[in-house]
Swiss-Prot record:
This is NAD(P)H dehydrogenase (quinone). Its EC number is 1.6.5.2. One of its GO terms (cellular component) is membrane. Binds 1 FMN per monomer. Signal peptide: none annotated. SUPFAM superfamilies: Flavoproteins. The lineage of its organism: Bacteria, Pseudomonadati, Thermodesulfobacteriota, Syntrophobacteria, Syntrophobacterales. It comes from Syntrophobacter fumaroxidans (strain DSM 10017 / MPOB).
Length: 204
């Protein structure tokens, strides 16, 4: 059973979360986690001016995802940073190229899930995931979130990302904050949860 993890990351926060999601997927017997990134749309000059060039080198080895890989997967987990309460434009452009999957119904009945990041605690994480879900619904996917059975969801002793809609991390106003142990645990839990649901959906 193949679980595809498709992400866009500018400074590495979503990449780190994607790695944790993959760990969760691999904890389920028979589940294979495959990491893929979507194509970058910003020029090298713009990335350099934003201080993202060095950060992106840490995940440059991850292959760029193709549309066909989505159709071949048993489940897909998407990761994107928040951009004004919505997904990043790079992810939007990638999804806009999946029309043929919609026509063929290649994703109908497959588990789909989303995780995200933002600079601030209330920076649009929930709206980003919920608006992303609309795309999955149009593809006929079965939406899977991060249930409250993940106990870190209810922690009150620290600032942390995470909601029933999906795992998330807070990068801070300068982007210096890295995903916390609790946020990474939520990502692992979500990966495992999606893999378990996908296994049930793919049983004959």
């Amino acid at each position: 059973m193949k679980v595809l993890i498709v992400f866009y990351s500018m400074y590495g926060h979503i990449y780190r979360m994607a790695e944790a999601v993959a760990e969760g997927v691999r904890s389920v017997d028979g589940a294979e986690a495959v990491l893929r990134r979507v194509p970058e749309t910003l020029s090298a000059e713009i990335l350099a001016s934003m201080g993202a060039t060095e950060a992106q080198k840490q995940f440059a080895h991850i292959p760029v995802c193709t549309v066909d890989e989505l159709g071949a997967a048993d489940a897909v987990i998407f990761g994107t940073p928040t951009r004004f309460g919505n997904m990043a434009g790079q992810m939007r452009q990638f999804l806009d190229a999946t029309g043929r999957l919609w026509v063929s119904g290649a994703l109908v009945g497959k588990a789909g899930s989303v995780f995200t990041s933002s600079n601030t605690q209330h920076g649009g994480q929930e709206s980003t995931i919920l608006s992303f879900h609309i795309n999955l619904l149009h593809q006929g996917m079965v939406i899977v979130g991060l249930p409250y059975s993940f106990q870190g969801q209810s922690t009150m002793d620290e600032i942390t990302g995470g909601s029933p809609y999906g795992a998330s991390t807070i990068a801070g106003p300068t982007g210096a904050r890295t995903p916390s142990d609790n946020e990474l645990a939520g990502a692992r839990y979500q990966g495992r949860h999606v893999a378990e649901i996908a296994r049930k959906l793919t049983r004959n």
